[in-house]
Amino acid sequence: MIFSHIIDRFQLKFKDREAAGNILAESLKNSIKKEERKNTIVLGIPRGGVIIGSTIANKLSCDFGIIVPRKLHAPHNEELGIGALMEDGTTYLNETLVKELEISPEYIKKEKLDQLEEIRRRTQLYSDKTFDWNQNDLSGKTVILADDGAATGATIIVAARYIKTNKNPGKLIITIPISPKGTINTLKNEDIDQIEVITIPQNGNFRSIEQYYQNFDQVTDKQVIDIIEGNLE
């Protein structure tokens, strides 16, 4: 695995998601040669990862699309992810956390059904407006997964597993501006070829992705659609 940790400053704050995407794109230019970029696709995770991904794709002149995993939330705490899933049922669970919180199988089953509904809603909303990578052969291609940060890594992990299992990419790259050290260590154990991360705080210093952005406004479905349509022009 190739691992690139770009900046080591705890106080670093990105102006916004586009600024973070530009830093990642500059780093990726060193590892993806110009002639390889025609065989590369960037997949952004909605919603914030779509801004990161589209910025990278535009800078590198690559194809761009979206991939829609969903976080599985802990009971009574929507900010805490206990895992994630894809529309086909591919699931990642943080078994340690599930055990610590004594989360029942019944709760997980219902949460999966709820999140599958949201996956289908978003997929239907976005699908006719983006490059349909899911219907295209990605065998041998370089696939870049982009998000605006990885707190637990659950959505990135489940998306990576889905692509590796179903799409046979030549290379799979994870690009994230911010992720705590413990999550990076978890990602390193996955079947991923390259990780690009800008800053890695120690676990005790990390509270949320938002604290590393000056502007972390919520991204709307309309913004996602506008970005997708802009990439198709």
Describe each region flagged by the PLM.
Residues 1-233:
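PRPP-associated nucleotide enzymes
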